[in-house]
């Protein structure tokens, strides 16, 4: 069954080019040209991945991303004409998985689509082998088989990538991991982003799992090196 892709771009010629090339690759493609229609289309079609322009009439891409993330966890690739660090970081903080700056190569974008689909929907063998092992860290319990986490009995809503990052750190408790290592291991060697992606995801995780994100007791920073998950008796 073909993977579904939703393309959201107010520039119809760009959307048409992406639709044509994605269909050539065997994907089922749906297009929207403004933010309001994009949300409706994503809710109706429940695609496997979304290509989302930031500058849109109606709701902008950031608002669409925020709204979609309330319900879905499919990969979202942000398309932007702004080569701005602020836009990239904000998009990642809202739950985007990747970003591409216009003008972009259609071949590169399709490669990113394939890479994001592969990372999101394929579990490494080692994850399957130990999936039944619950991990307890103080007040937090990780359920790898259900891709879920509870804190003091309450569910913590994590994105797919947030869960993978926290689960990976939990399996290497107390071991400092560099940003580069986490990017390669959790996001994959074919990920096109930079290490700032790790920082943004860590920040989102802390906001969800820490009682006081400014003074974390679970995910700790080793300044100048990376991050580790604090051991608790």
UniProtKB/Swiss-Prot annotation:
SMART domains assigned to the protein according to its UniProt record, in alphabetical order: REC (SM00448), Trans_reg_C (SM00862)
SUPFAM superfamilies assigned: C-terminal effector domain of the bipartite response regulators (SSF46894), CheY-like (SSF52172)
Residues with the 4-aspartylphosphate modification: 53
Record GO terms (molecular function): phosphorelay response regulator activity; transcription cis-regulatory region binding
Organism listed in the record: Staphylococcus saprophyticus subsp. saprophyticus (strain ATCC 15305 / DSM 20229 / NCIMB 8711 / NCTC 7292 / S-41)
Function per UniProt: Member of the two-component regulatory system WalK/WalR.
Family matches, as Gene3D superfamilies: 3.40.50.2300, 6.10.250.690, Winged helix-like DNA-binding domain superfamily/Winged helix DNA-binding domain (1.10.10.10)
Post-translational modification: Phosphorylated by WalK.
Domain Response regulatory: start-end pairs: 4-117
Protein's GO biological process: regulation of DNA-templated transcription
Subcellular location: Cytoplasm
GO cellular component, one term: protein-DNA complex
Protein name: Transcriptional regulatory protein WalR
Keywords from the named record: Activator, Cytoplasm, DNA-binding, Phosphoprotein, Transcription, Transcription regulation, Two-component regulatory system
Residues of the DNA-binding region: 132-231
Name of encoding gene: walR
């Amino acid at each position: 069954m073909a993977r579904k892709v939703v393309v959201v771009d107010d520039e119809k010629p760009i959307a048409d080019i992406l639709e044509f090339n994605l269909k050539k690759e065997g994907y089922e493609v749906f297009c929207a040209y403004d933010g309001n229609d994009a949300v409706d289309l994503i809710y109706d079609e429940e695609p496997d991945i979304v290509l989302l322009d930031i500058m849109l009439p109606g709701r902008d891409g950031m608002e669409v991303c925020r709204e979609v993330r309330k319900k879905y966890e499919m990969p979202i690739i942000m398309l932007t004409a702004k080569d701005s660090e602020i836009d990239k970081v904000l998009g990642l903080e809202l739950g985007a998985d990747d970003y591409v700056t216009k003008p972009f190569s259609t071949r590169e974008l399709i490669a990113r689509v394939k890479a994001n689909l592969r990372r999101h929907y394929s579990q490494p063998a080692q994850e399957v082998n130990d999936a039944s092992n619950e991990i307890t860290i103080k007040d937090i319990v990780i359920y790898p088989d259900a891709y879920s986490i509870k804190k003091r009995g309450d569910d913590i809503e994590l994105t797919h990538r947030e869960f993978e990052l926290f689960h990976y750190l939990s399996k290497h408790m107390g071991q400092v991991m560099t940003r580069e290592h986490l990017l390669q291991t959790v996001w994959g060697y074919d990920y096109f982003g930079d290490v700032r992606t790790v920082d943004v995801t860590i920040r989102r995780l802390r906001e969800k799992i820490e009682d006081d994100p400014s003074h974390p007791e679970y995910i700790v920073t080793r300044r100048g090196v990376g991050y580790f998950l604090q051991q608790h008796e």
